[in-house]
Regions:
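Exposed extracellular interaction/assembly regions and N-terminal maturation sites
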Residues: 2-112, 187-188
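Short, surface-exposed terminal/edge motifs of secreted or surface/virion proteins that either
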Residues: 31-46, 108-117, 132-150, 180-188, ...
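Extracellular beta-strand solenoids
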Residues: 93, 102, 143, 150-153, ...
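Tight coil/turn sites that cap or link beta-strands
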Residues: 96, 127-130, 180
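Short, aromatic/His-centered strand-loop micro-motif at the edge of beta-sheets
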Residues: 117-125
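Short, recurring structural edge motifs at helix starts
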Residues: 120, 159-160
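Alpha-helix capping/hinge segments and adjacent helical runs
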Residues: 162-164
């Protein structure tokens, strides 16, 4: 009786009584090879697959899963896209239940979309970013953690936190500004009383009495 394979990771299932004397080798490959080439469960949990330029045609790479417990790109935990692209890229993955950590390290500065083979949609990953995605086995690629190109705040981020918002500071000492800063003259409003001791440019004919 021939072996069968699991639906998602394609691990080999040995029929009862089969592979006498050699089943241990099959089991070891299912668990993970002792060599530098990762297989089976080990590849699915910690394996990293590089997606090079040679895997892409017209900026599209498609990966499938066959009935084999040997190394397969689509089984790897990490998909590291290193290809040189000339436009926005697409990586097609098989219709299985599988989490991926995807690195868009492609050359060319383009985003790459991860999607199920033959379907639209998917998750777009900006160049230089890393994103968790999950294929649910029902033609969907879901993102567990989207990259946020912009962030909206309820209020301006204070200067002390690296922003441009106004911050309140107390204490003594010198105020240090950048070279040639632009100073904005404050609007003081109309005071109701006060003593002016030193000023320039005040027209004395405007509402002023005294000697």
């Amino acid at each position: 009786m021939a072996s069968t394979y699991t639906a998602n990771l394609k691990l080999e299932l040995i029929p009862t009584g089969a592979q006498s004397g050699i089943w241990g080798a099959t089991t070891n490959i299912n668990l993970g090879s002792s060599s530098a080439t990762q297989t089976g469960i080990e590849q699915a949990i910690v394996g990293k697959a590089t997606l090079p330029t040679g895997d892409f045609s017209s900026n599209v790479a498609t990966y499938t899963m066959s009935d084999s417990n040997a190394t397969q790109t689509a089984r790897a935990f990490v998909l590291d896209i290193t290809a040189t692209l000339t436009a926005a890229g697409t990586v097609n993955v098989p219709q299985i239940q599988k989490p991926y950590l995807v690195f868009n390290n492609s050359v060319g500065g383009f985003a790459v979309t991860i999607r199920v083979t033959g379907l639209g949609g998917g998750i777009s990953i900006p160049n230089g970013k890393k994103v968790w995605v999950y294929t649910d086995g029902a033609n969907n690629v879901l993102s567990a953690l989207d990259y946020l190109p912009t962030l909206s705040l309820g209020a301006a981020l204070p200067v002390l936190s690296g922003g441009t918002g106004v911050t309140t500071s107390t204490g003594t000492g010198s105020v240090v500004l950048s070279t040639s800063p632009t100073l904005v003259t404050p609007i003081l409003g109309t005071p109701t009383s006060g003593t002016l001791t030193n000023a320039t440019g005040l027209p004395l004919t405007t509402g002023v009495t005294g000697t």
